[in-house]
Amino acid sequence: MATLHRKLLGLLPRVGVQVLDLGSGAAVVYRRGVRRRVALGKGADLVLRGRTAAWKQVPLGGTGARLLLDEKETAADERTFQLSAASYLCGQHVTALLDRYEVNCVLDVGANSGQYGRQLRRLGYTGRIVSFEPTAEAFAKLRQAAEGDPDWQVHQIGLGREDTTQSIHVGWNTMNSLLPPSDYGKGRYKRFAKTRTEEIEVRRLDGMLDTVLAGIDAPRPYLKMDTQGYDLEVFAGAGERAAEFVGMQSEVATLRLYEGSPRMGEAIAVYEERGFEITGMYPVSREEATGRVVEFDCVMVRATAVPART
């Protein structure tokens, strides 16, 4: 059979069909142009069109993983490449932590339209997700994203230092905030030039936890916050019950986008004082002109909460 296969491949060029033999009984057939094979590793090949394709494989240490790059494209927009890589690596890191720390409930505070919850499911997390999004337009999209997922709860409220009602700035896409923009923020984002407000309900997190964790035996919650400058207020509302979280994630700013928001050092100091330690820092946004990082996703754990390996 193998000999017949080879004979048939050998006949194809006579009728104008080209063959790129990949070995092990595999081949690519094509009519025009040039194809090149780049071996990526055992059982994996990349087939390139043309003679000058710029794809390059970069081994990632001794992990067996390989990064496949179009060097010309990545060099032309290094900033976007770095941010995209950071987003991917952050997702992988968080997923690994959720597994290592046996997390069975993720609180997604500042859920917007459900991007974080969808990512968790895509990366394999199967535990409970509880998402909080106070604005009407985003919440409608969030509720739709969670439909059909019985262990993904959604709440149309904001979280903060006290139970109250507040006005939130809306119309800023994913950057809606309870805080007004800073002068730096106004200069960076044109969207801040126009705003309207919406009245929302705000609750303390410690008053919500019993409801959120109901029905879970031995809860091991993880707190994700992305509230556009308001994360410390959310955290303050956890009170003494912050000690129940085995890990957390907060968007921390090196450059203030919102008036009255904390700088990165201030926020991290508060989290560390409550027993959390950093496991990863991933750039979320960077200035195009200077390369300065504007915001990081800061991932932290309570090291004493790690389960013993069996």
Show which residues each predicted segment covers.
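Phosphate/nucleotide-binding beta-alpha loop and adjacent structural elements of enzyme active sites
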Residues: 1-310
